[in-house]
């Protein structure tokens, strides 16, 4: 079903206006996570997260699952430095990729909370992240801390964008999303060495450097980059001829409403798509790379493809993955199929309502809004809430034909835009 609409509906607008329209206001249908609300920052809370006057914010690029994480061989690192954790390699890689948090961040926090990775005792294996998580068990704590970091990171970014849209100052204290996420988490639960003068990020930076040999100049970033990064991210959209839809050219699938990667909160970086939205046990279909790039297999059910420009797409609930780490692919290269079995679709746990592809857009490791992104001839308008399926607000606009395509209606993939 297609609805002819005026081209004016899809005309460019102010990035900050789009931000206001696209900020999360709820919605948990088809949620991929635990239905937790977005982390809400306030001026009062941020007043408790001040960096020491001599400190610089942490580099977002080393916090997120971007180029540094993709170049990191987690399994080999664990085999050499933490053999007791080697069988957890896929679990760590999967959830680090899902939340797009560098696994080095997680390993650093483990050392800070439970001691050296090389010979963990029974307590450390049961609670590797100590007081940072109220959960019990290795797997539960790992996922909980990654989830907390993700919620805090994007909650801070959302707060900054709201402030900018209201024409209020942002970034004046040099605090960025990575620093806010880690500082908030560490202040709540971590033991801070008196040597660090009560500065949890100082202890974190020293531990990170010791574990991975990262120069201080790379681990930190100038304070004046914060506001510039925010302004640039608000206007982000991939080149109009870079991406196609993530299913075979010549086929029609049915996407649902845009939502955050976890199904609640911000940004609306993701949509789910299926050929016919069947029940578990039904036939499923080929998932393809939406663009050219380098493959990262995050687990048996999750793949990422990263373009040299920094744009990336994530593919979750996969089966029969037929690409490998480091492989170069072009747009429309088959990656696998979306899983028809719930245990395969959720290979490392989680939740899902039925067979589908969970597709996400990222830039330099950060989830970014689909607003204004083009996939072939279609430009997306994300709506005003998670899983907003109302075609007056959420739609794929065919820029060539001037037609608007609604959620849960077959959407034909003609390939890349010419």
UniProtKB/Swiss-Prot annotation:
Its GO CC terms are: extracellular space
- Residues of the active site: 317, 356
SUPFAM superfamilies xrefs: Duplicated hybrid motif (SSF51261)
Entry's induction text: Optimal protein expression in vivo requires both Zn(2+) and Ca(2+) during growth (at protein level).
Location in the cell reads:
Secreted
Indicate whether Disulfide bond appears among the record's keywords.
yes
- Enumerate the Gene Ontology biological process terms: peptidoglycan catabolic process; protein secretion by the type II secretion system; protein transport by the Sec complex; proteolysis
Extract the Gene3D superfamilies matched here: Glucose Permease (Domain IIA)
Knocked-out gene: effects: Loss of staphylolytic activity (lysis of heat-killed S.aureus).
In which domain of life is the source organism classified? Bacteria
- InterPro entries per UniProt: Cell_wall_metabolism_enzyme (IPR050570), Dup_hybrid_motif (IPR011055), Pept_M23A_Blytic (IPR000841), Peptidase_M23 (IPR016047)
Cysteine pairs forming cystine bridges in this chain are 301-347, 391-406
What are the binding positions for Zn(2+) in this chain? 259, 272, 358
Taking the first listed entry, what is the main subcellular location of this protein, grouped into a coarse class? secreted
Keyword Zinc tagged:
yes
CDD domains recorded: M23_peptidase
Family statement:
Belongs to the peptidase M23A family.
Please identify the protein, giving its name as recorded. Answer: Protease LasA
């Amino acid at each position: 079903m297609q609805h002819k609409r005026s081209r004016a509906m899809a005309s460019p607008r102010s990035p900050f206006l789009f931000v206001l329209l696209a900020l999360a206001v709820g919605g948990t249908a088809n949620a991929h996570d635990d239905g937790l609300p977005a982390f809400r920052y306030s001026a009062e809370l941020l007043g408790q997260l001040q960096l020491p006057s001599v400190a610089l914010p942490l580099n977002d690029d080393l916090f997120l699952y971007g180029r540094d994480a993709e170049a990191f061989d987690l399994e080999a690192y664990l085999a050499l430095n933490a053999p007791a954790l080697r069988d957890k390699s896929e679990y760590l890689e999967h959830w680090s990729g899902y939340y797009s948090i560098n696994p080095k961040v997680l390993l650093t926090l483990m050392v800070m909370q439970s001691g050296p990775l090389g010979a963990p005792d029974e307590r450390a294996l049961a609670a590797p992240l100590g007081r940072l998580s109220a959960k019990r068990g290795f797997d539960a704590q790992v996922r909980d801390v990654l989830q907390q970091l993700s919620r805090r990171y994007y909650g801070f970014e959302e707060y900054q964008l709201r402030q900018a849209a209201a024409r209020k100052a942002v970034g004046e204290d040099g605090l960025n999303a990575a620093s806010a996420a880690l500082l908030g988490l560490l202040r709540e639960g971590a033991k801070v060495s008196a040597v660090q003068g009560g500065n949890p990020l100082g202890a974190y930076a020293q531990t990170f450097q010791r574990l991975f040999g990262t120069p201080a100049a790379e681990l930190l970033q100038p304070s004046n980059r914060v506001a510039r990064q925010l302004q640039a991210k608000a206007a982000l959209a991939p080149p109009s001829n870079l991406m196609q839809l993530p299913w075979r050219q010549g086929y029609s699938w049915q996407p649902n409403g845009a939502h955050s990667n976890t199904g609640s909160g911000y940004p609306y970086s993701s949509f789910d798509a299926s050929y016919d939205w069947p029940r578990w046990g039904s036939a499923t279909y080929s998932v393809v790379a939406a663009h050219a790039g380098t493959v990262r297999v995050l687990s048996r059910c999750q793949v990422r493809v990263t373009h040299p420009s920094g744009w990336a797409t994530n593919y979750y609930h996969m089966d029969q993955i037929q690409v490998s780490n480091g492989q170069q692919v072009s747009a429309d290269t088959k990656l696998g199929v979306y899983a028809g079995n719930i245990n395969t679709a959720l290979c490392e746990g989680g939740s899902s309502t039925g067979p589908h592809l969970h597709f996400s857009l990222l830039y330099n490791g950060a989830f970014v809004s689909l607003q204004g992104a083009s996939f072939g001839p279609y430009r997306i308008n994300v709506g005003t809430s998670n899983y907003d399926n109302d075609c007056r607000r959420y739609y794929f606009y065919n820029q060539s034909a001037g037609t608007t395509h609604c959620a849960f209606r077959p959407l034909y993939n003609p390939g890349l835009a010419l």
